[in-house]
Amino acid sequence: MNSINIAIDGPASSGKSTVAKIIAKNLNYTYLDTGAMYRCATYLALQHGYEAQDVSKILGLLAERPISFGKAEDGSQTVFLGTEEVTLAIRQNDVTNNVSWVSAIPEIREELVNQQRRIAKDGAIIMDGRDIGTVVLPDAELKIFLVASVDERAERRFKENQEKGIESDFETLKSEIAARDYKDSHREVSPLKAAEDAIEFDTTGVSIEGVVTFIQEKAEKIIDMKN
């Protein structure tokens, strides 16, 4: 069966990762968490007290401790930097609040985008992020751009943090998400925007199952046409 690449983009907490993981499982595709890769770079920078001007040092750390993905017993994805598992460490608030400046560094983006493209060259990949359809996989057969209100996204992040035991305040999350939106859409390198040929879908008030069904039906139609 011919496979395709699927790009799912959108702002913070628009449901990209949750949906991408489910669809990957349903289609037996590989889910590549690009956001986790930028979080890994951010985690390394924070661990060593590096700032934007220390780009060569951050790249050096990424070379010393390559990013890889594994699977936990329950099937969920695990993330490693070298031999250290950082699945939960990269989801802490200090990483979340610093990932924008790290991911805006052109050399960091270039290195991680090259890694992502290498992984996707054989197809059957689902990637989510902010510039997958525009920069990383411009030739992806299906491009989706998810949006949702700031309130809805803050609510999702709040529940997610509660489940992971991460302390957070709802109003603070709202302001952090709004600030992240602004940074992501105004940065010089790969700003957050929908690809011209992307299908935009507002997930406000839509269940996860509803979003999955919408995207999967589109994917299956394209796969059928290729076979």
UniProtKB/Swiss-Prot annotation:
| List of residues binding ATP | 10-18
Gene Ontology, cellular component aspect:
cytosol
InterPro entries to which the protein is assigned, alphabetical: Cytidylate_kin, Cytidylate_kinase_dom, P-loop_NTPase
Which reaction is this enzyme known to catalyze? Answer: CMP + ATP = CDP + ADP; dCMP + ATP = dCDP + ADP
Report the sequence similarity comment from the record. Belongs to the cytidylate kinase family. Type 1 subfamily.
Q: Name one GO molecular function term.
A: dCMP kinase activity
Top-level taxon in the UniProt lineage: Bacteria
SUPFAM superfamilies given for it? P-loop containing nucleoside triphosphate hydrolases
Against NCBIfam families, the record matches this protein to: cmk
Q: Give the UniProt record's GO annotations in the biological process aspect.
A: nucleobase-containing small molecule interconversion; pyrimidine nucleotide metabolic process
Q: Keywords, A to Z? A: ATP-binding, Cytoplasm, Kinase, Nucleotide-binding, Transferase
Protein name in UniProt: Cytidylate kinase
UniProt-listed Enzyme Commission number(s): 2.7.4.25
The subcellular localization recorded is: Cytoplasm
